[in-house]
């Protein structure tokens, strides 16, 4: 009888210990599609933390014939797993070049996400006022010019006419461009009647860093309150790579020092520029922000307050 009691007691103790361990130890997040690793981020996200740059892909929507990037499905349900892993609760869905000016998938994703999401669309000057109003009602607050990716549906000639169309709506212009574009179009960027937002730290090369004249041009826009930068895509220009991306840190930290009130953060999930067997670890990318911005109050500003202002979150 005593042997049986000991066995039962041992089993109960083991079960209890396992339950306590499950409560006290960090939960292992479910594997997120298009992301390396499964551990949660070490940095605690504040309430209403916002991922200001990600995409949604679905094979249900027609691909633009000129599109170069054609990832597999990366759905709303998949992205929610990423939110659970890193702790963000608000998000900005960016129309990818894959679908050109067909924003149907973007609108569907915004509807599924609900009021905690905003969007950035891709349009051309022929877009009607009714279409712009419908996009606004769906949660869109900006339009994107992807000049860097071949086969994009937009061009520099479209910037001025579209800027005039959206300025009164409280929208912004989002630019996926390189340093050469920034330097060649400084007057345009300064004079358009709405804010300008640069994807992925404006693609400043790690080799030149803050010495690059395009960095100076971007900082000038930030300090005027005209420009914004997304602290995202560290892997795009880094030669050092994961987990430190140390050759990019100086650029990110210099942006923070220059104008923390004009910065937002983004994951760039599902990382369409990266091969499927070389996706970054999204928890590592989120934790980078704490290294770049050790001051929690400033970090919260970048994750919560700045996005609320730029994307009209109430």
Q: Would you name each region that the model predicts?
A:
Residues 46-48, 87-91, 113-118, 139-141, ...:
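Short, well-ordered coil/turn segments that N-cap beta-strands
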Residues 50-54, 92-94, 119-121, 143-145, ...:
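Hydrophobic faces of well-ordered beta-strands that scaffold small-molecule active sites
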Residues 53, 106, 166, 229, ...:
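Conserved, mostly hydrophobic/aromatic
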Residues 156-265:
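Catalytic pocket-lining loop regions of alpha/beta-barrel enzymes
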């Amino acid at each position: 009888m005593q042997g049986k009691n000991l066995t039962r007691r041992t089993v109960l103790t083991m079960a209890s210990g396992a339950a306590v361990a499950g409560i006290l130890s960090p939960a292992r997040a479910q594997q997120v599609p298009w992301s390396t690793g499964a551990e949660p981020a070490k940095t605690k996200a504040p309430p209403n933390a916002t991922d200001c740059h990600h995409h949604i892909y679905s094979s249900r929507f027609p691909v633009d014939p000129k599109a170069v990037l054609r990832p597999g499905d990366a759905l709303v349900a998949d992205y929610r797993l990423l939110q659970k892993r890193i702790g963000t609760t608000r998000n900005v869905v960016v129309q990818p070049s894959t679908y050109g000016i067909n924003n149907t998938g973007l609108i569907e994703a915004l509807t599924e996400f609900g009021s905690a999401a905003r969007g950035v669309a891709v349009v051309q000057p022929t877009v009607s006022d009714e279409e712009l109003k419908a996009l606004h009602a769906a949660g869109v607050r900006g339009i994107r010019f992807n000049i860097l990716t071949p086969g994009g549906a937009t061009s520099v000639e479209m910037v001025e006419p579209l800027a005039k169309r959206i300025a009164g709506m409280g929208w912004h212009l989002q630019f996926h461009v390189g340093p050469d574009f920034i330097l060649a179009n400084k007057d345009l960027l300064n004079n358009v009647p709405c804010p300008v937002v640069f994807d992925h730290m404006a693609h400043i090369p790690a080799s030149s860093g803050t010495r690059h004249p395009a960095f100076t041009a971007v900082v000038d826009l930030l300090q005027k309150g005209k420009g914004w930068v997304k602290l995202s895509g560290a892997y795009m220009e880094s030669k050092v790579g994961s987990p430190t991306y140390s050759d990019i840190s100086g650029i990110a930290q210099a942006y923070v020092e220059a104008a923390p009130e004009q910065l937002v953060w983004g994951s760039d999930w599902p990382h369409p520029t990266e091969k499927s067997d070389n996706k970054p670890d999204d928890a590592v990318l989120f934790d980078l922000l704490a290294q770049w911005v050790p001051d929690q109050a400033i970090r919260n500003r970048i994750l919560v307050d700045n996005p609320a202002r730029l994307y009209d979150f109430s």
